[in-house]
């Protein structure tokens, strides 16, 4: 989920103030926490441009931790804290205050100078200006205290990893969610799983759970193939310390520095793994034909049964969705399935085999164990609301509790993968730190994307939100949950209060009724609260545990419970991510923000205009649903920090701004019908106020760019796509909530489809694909109105009906029109399709449109004039208006 306004990120390194902070994977130079080695070798990361603007704030704490040497028995300090240098922070806050004063003075001036000749438009614009000021303030105040926290991975290793190769790190369950192998290409999902299995985390301490919410045998068989390939891929990653550990992304990189321990074997191993991966992809693609052929063969052998079943490789009927849907075997109506693909490994390293004819890669010095891998397809039956992604993750929560019950959980969408193998360790640093670790419900990592066009035309990276706003929230109660790449504390998801509000740790389960009637699950809750315990070996899948797993996945399990309300991920809202994070914050938990270099996780994003707008529509509609629900941040949550409440009000109410913004964007139509552009007099004073307010906003933005590590293009794209969203989808989101308030259905939200480019030449093919949809037309109208307004203004100026003062006022109005067109420029490129590869064509078309409309306006004015006629002679000449002076 993303919101308007700025964004923020934590991470990176700082060389200022003697803190010696590191960038993600590096240790800090100022010593460590309790029990750390004072003489530990420091590995400094490459300094990024933004790091010089940050200084440490925890030097006294770190010095005290080093001095006691861990003798106090407390956990170490596992992250460093930084704030923006005063040379930037003080001007940033001062500019914010000055702009606020300017907005207040502007509003007072407007109230004292009503425009009698256009009171209707004046009142609308005054209300709009007031709302713009309020929404800006709501967005800005959350960024006045940005904080960066940088994990100390070296100290974590010193404290928890043992010399014999074992580790005392806590257990971690990783959730992956997917639905459709077509709209969500399976190669993405399987790469995500491979990167999780190969992550730099104790093998016996983390497990991976794939939730297939479509119950597709394609995913099941694909996971079997992935488990086989992982036996080669994961040891290869460990032997050569490669990054990233998703093979599709790894092999796409032409070259990178070698960091492994066997350089003499690397080239041959690399070639062999590349061949194996290509064959693996062929096998995955072949499943779409192999499974139907296999099923046809079995169906012919069982023709007397009269059904066209889908068959598994072992000759049993697939209990999930069939290729030819049948009763009890179709989407929305099938049995639950759970299958352990890779068993839980032993807690002792297991070395592989030396190179041989069958396997030319030498793994004799490599631990070849693999983490536990589980396939889940929950039960679905007619008459039950399955609650989409939130419902699937709640089933994962219960099933994993019965099998591994790790105290920490991290969730991914099916198209995201682990880009930095140490990312899991980074999140654990925040969870185990002795300062706020126990009260931290989740650690949010920023979203980063592959295959986005170089100019990021549709602001997919959303850097202003992820690298500024979330960094600001990090200084309050913590960032919001954005749906993927987030590490949770299991008991926090269960609705348990944080320790600061729960002095009695023994009273974790206050009511079994809210969790359901499964005793084994309820008994697992207090066990999960022990965050430093290891994953115990899961029970054997005997009849009793299989029945418990079946009960946990049953549709009726949640009836009469608090699942989807105060337990697990929240239901009945399009943005279950934001409201789930809000539920945790309002009960007193805090969150942390972690940015690493290289990026912790990466994924795919829609680069097609229509798909991107549908994504924004779902986010904005869900935001308003939250605002008008019992989770409204305006009222809910007595434990919510006041500034955090303001941030959530902004994140949920921002689409309302589009109502007034759309009025301003369509206001230039007055050029056409009235020939004036006044909503306030004296007009020059009005424009002067606007220039001051806008200039102050841009100045604030330039300072924000510095401390957040953004680029000017990031800032421009954020402004452009906010205007595009405000014209195309935010009004639909407002309409959606109005309809729902009247008990009607509301607007349907379309899930974003992901596609795999088949060749390098088609890498950005979706960018140039025009998918016409109704939500495109409001922005097209705004473009047309502003082009017509500029053309009409030119026509009126040439016709000679304006005084010099009127032309001066008109020129100020034209600046507004041109500014609108520049902001909507990416949208205009999007609807041009492949013509947008030559952007100059757009400018030529716009200029031609200006000329045509100006000539048309001149002709209309001339024909309406009582003393002047405009007509053409056969010879091709023309009689021009007398006011032109010819």
UniProtKB/Swiss-Prot annotation:
EC number(s) reported in the record: 2.4.1.-
Subcellular location as annotated: Golgi apparatus membrane
Keyword Magnesium: no
GO cellular component, one term: plasma membrane
Annotated active site: 213, 577
Gene Ontology terms: biological process: cell wall organization; cellulose biosynthetic process; plant-type primary cell wall biogenesis
Record field: transmembrane: 87-107, 118-138, 659-679, 683-703, 723-743, 775-795, 812-832, 840-860
Membrane-topology descriptor: Multi-pass membrane protein
An example molecular function term from Gene Ontology annotations: cellulose synthase (UDP-forming) activity
Protein name per its UniProtKB record: Probable mixed-linked glucan synthase 8
Classification lineage: Eukaryota, Viridiplantae, Streptophyta, Embryophyta, Tracheophyta
The encoding gene: CSFL8
């Amino acid at each position: 989920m993303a919101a308007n306004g700025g964004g923020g990120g934590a991470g990176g390194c700082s060389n200022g103030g003697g803190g010696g902070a590191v960038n993600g994977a590096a240790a800090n130079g100022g010593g460590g926490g309790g029990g750390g080695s004072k003489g530990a070798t420091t590995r400094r990361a490459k300094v990024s441009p933004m790091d010089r603007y940050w200084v440490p704030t925890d030097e006294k704490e770190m010095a005290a931790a080093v001095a006691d040497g861990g003798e106090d028995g407390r956990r170490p300090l596992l992250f460093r804290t930084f704030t923006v240098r005063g040379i930037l922070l003080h001007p940033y806050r001062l500019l914010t205050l000055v702009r606020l004063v300017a907005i207040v003075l502007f509003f007072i001036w407007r109230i004292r100078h009503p425009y009698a000749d256009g009171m209707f438009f004046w009142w609308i614009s005054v209300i709009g200006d007031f709302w713009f000021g309020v929404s800006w303030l709501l967005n800005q105040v959350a960024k006045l205290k940005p904080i960066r926290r940088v994990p100390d991975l070296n100290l974590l290793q010193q404290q928890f990893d043992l010399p014999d190769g074992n580790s005392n790190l806590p257990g971690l369950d990783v959730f992956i969610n997917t639905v459709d192998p077509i709209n969500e290409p399976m190669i993405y999902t399987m790469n995500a799983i491979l990167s999780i299995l190969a992550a730099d985390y104790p093998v016996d301490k983390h497990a991976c759970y794939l939730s297939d919410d479509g119950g597709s045998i394609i995913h099941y068989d694909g996971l079997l193939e992935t488990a086989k390939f992982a036996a080669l891929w994961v040891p290869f990653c460990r032997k050569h310390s490669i990054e990233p550990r998703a093979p599709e992304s790894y092999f796409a990189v032409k070259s990178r520095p070698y960091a492994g321990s066997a350089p003499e074997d690397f080239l041959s191993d690399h070639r062999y793994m590349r061949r194996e991966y290509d064959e693996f992809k062929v096998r995955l693609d072949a499943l779409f034909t192999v499974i139907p052929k296999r099923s046809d063969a079995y169906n012919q052998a069982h023709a007397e049964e009269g059904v066209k079943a889908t068959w598994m490789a072992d000759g049993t009927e697939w209990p999930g969705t069939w290729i030819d849907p049948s009763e009890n075997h179709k989407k929305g109506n099938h049995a639950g399935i759970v299958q352990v693909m890779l068993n839980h490994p032993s807690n002792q390293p297991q070395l592989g085999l030396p190179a041989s004819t069958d396997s030319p890669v030498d793994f004799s010095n490599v631990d070849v164990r693999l983490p536990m891998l589980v396939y889940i397809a929950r039960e679905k039956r007619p008459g039950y609301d399955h609650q989409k992604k939130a419902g699937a993750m709640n089933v994962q929560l219960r099933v994993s509790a019965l099998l591994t019950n790790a105290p920490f959980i991290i969730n991914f969408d099916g198209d995201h993968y682990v880009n930095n193998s140490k990312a899991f360790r980074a999140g654990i640093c925040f969870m185990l730190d002795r300062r706020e670790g126990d009260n931290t419900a989740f650690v949010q990592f920023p979203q980063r994307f592959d295959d986005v066009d170089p100019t990021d035309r549709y602001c997919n990276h959303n850097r202003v939100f992820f690298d500024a706003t979330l960094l600001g929230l990090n200084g309050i109660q913590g960032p919001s949950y954005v749906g993927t790449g987030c590490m949770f504390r299991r008991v926090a998801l269960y609705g348990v209060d944080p320790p600061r509000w729960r002095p009695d740790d023994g009273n974790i389960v206050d009511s079994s009724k809210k969790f359901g009637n499964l005793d084994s699950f309820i008994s697992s809750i207090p066990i999960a609260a022990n965050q430093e315990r290891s994953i115990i070996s899961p029970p054997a899948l005997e009849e009793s545990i299989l029945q418990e797993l079946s009960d946990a996945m049953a549709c009726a399990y949640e009836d009469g419970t608090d699942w989807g309300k105060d337990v697990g991920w929240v239901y009945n809202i399009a943005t279950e991510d934001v409201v789930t994070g809000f539920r945790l914050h309002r009960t007193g938990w805090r969150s942390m923000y972690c940015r690493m270099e290289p990026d912790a996780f990466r994924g795919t994003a829609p680069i097609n205009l229509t798909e991107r707008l549908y994504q924004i529509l779902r986010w904005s509609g869900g935001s308003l649903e939250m605002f008008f629900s019992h989770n409204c941040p305006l009222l809910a949550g007595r434990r919510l920090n006041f500034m955090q409440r303001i941030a959530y009000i902004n994140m949920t109410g921002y689409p309302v701004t589009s109502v007034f913004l759309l009025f301003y964007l369509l206001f230039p139509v007055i050029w056409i019908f009235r020939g004036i552009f006044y909503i306030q007099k004296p007009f020059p004073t009005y424009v002067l106020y606007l220039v001051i307010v806008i200039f102050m906003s841009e100045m604030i933005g330039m300072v924000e760019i510095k401390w957040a590590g953004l680029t000017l293009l990031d800032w421009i794209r954020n402004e452009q796509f906010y205007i595009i969203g405000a014209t195309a989808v935010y009004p639909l989101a407002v309409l959606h909530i109005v309809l729902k308030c009247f008990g009607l259905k509301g607007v349907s939200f379309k899930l974003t489809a992901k596609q795999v480019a088949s060749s390098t030449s088609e890498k950005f093919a979706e960018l140039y694909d025009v998918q016409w949809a109704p939500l495109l037309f409001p922005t097209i109208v705004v473009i047309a109105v502003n082009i017509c307004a500029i053309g009409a203004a030119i026509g009126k100026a040439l016709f000679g009906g304006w005084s010099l003062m009127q032309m001066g006022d008109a020129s100020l109005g034209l600046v507004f029109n041109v500014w609108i067109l520049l902001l909507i420029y990416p949208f205009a490129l999007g609807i041009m399709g492949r013509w947008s590869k030559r952007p100059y064509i757009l400018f030529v078309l716009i200029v031609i449109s200006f000329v045509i409309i100006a000539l048309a306006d001149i002709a209309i004015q001339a024909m309406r004039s009582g003393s002047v006629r405009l007509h053409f002679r056969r010879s091709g000449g023309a009689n021009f208006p007398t006011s032109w002076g010819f």
